[in-house]
């Protein structure tokens, strides 16, 4: 999410730098984005008119606001703290981390953002400062392949993501060839796990 009322996201004329917000956490939406059937969408007109009801979830300590400012703060709040691209506008997706198909919703977010950027005729860099220890981490799962395809579909598209911030807590297993070996992994946090299998046909077992 994002605190779109922060001065660093408002230009010199008093208009928002946030072009769109898609809040995927809204359970009973009244305005879902085109091509998607969940979450609530607002545009810059809604924000400027004061009818956007999106709230940056306090449970995530303003994380979305922080990373948005690092990317595109115009420095209005203090005239000293600027983002990497202070003249850039923002398209924000508030992720639902409790979704049963969280990675799928991330791929939806990528499609949504690139589509909106295309409609404005602008290049686009997507920042995903989030991650998971689940999955293969080899870029071959369906959601990763979908994101890769979206990114490569047109020029002027880029995507950056967090490389991990677990520090010395190695809560993941590094993959290697098991064709002639046995792997034993102890999972610290759960008494049971579900391991999906991906067939070449695309089926998930």
Predicted regions mapped to residue ranges:
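Subtilisin-like serine protease catalytic core
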Residues: 1-104, 121, 154, 158, ...
């Amino acid at each position: 999410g994002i605190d779109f009322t922060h001065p660093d996201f408002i230009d010199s004329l008093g208009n928002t730098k946030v072009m769109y917000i898609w809040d995927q956490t809204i359970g009973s939406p009244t305005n879902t984005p085109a091509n998607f059937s969940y979450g609530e969408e607002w545009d810059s007109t809604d924000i400027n008119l004061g009818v956007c009801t999106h709230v940056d979830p306090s449970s995530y300590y303003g994380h979305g606001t922080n990373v948005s400012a690092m990317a595109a703060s115009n420095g209005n709040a203090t005239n000293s703290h600027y983002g990497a691209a202070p003249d850039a506008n923002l398209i924000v997706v508030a992720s639902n981390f409790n979704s049963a198909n969280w990675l799928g919703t991330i791929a939806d977010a990528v499609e949504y953002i690139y589509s909106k950027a295309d409609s404005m005729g602008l290049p686009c860099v997507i920042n995903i400062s989030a991650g998971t220890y689940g999955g293969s981490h080899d870029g071959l799962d369906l959601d990763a392949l979908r994101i890769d395809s979206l990114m490569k579909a047109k020029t002027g598209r880029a995507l950056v993501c967090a490389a991990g911030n677990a520090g010395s807590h190695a809560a993941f297993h590094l993959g290697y060839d098991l064709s002639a070996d046995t792997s034993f992994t102890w999972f610290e946090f759960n008494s049971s796990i579900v391991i999906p299998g991906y067939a070449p046909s695309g089926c998930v077992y």
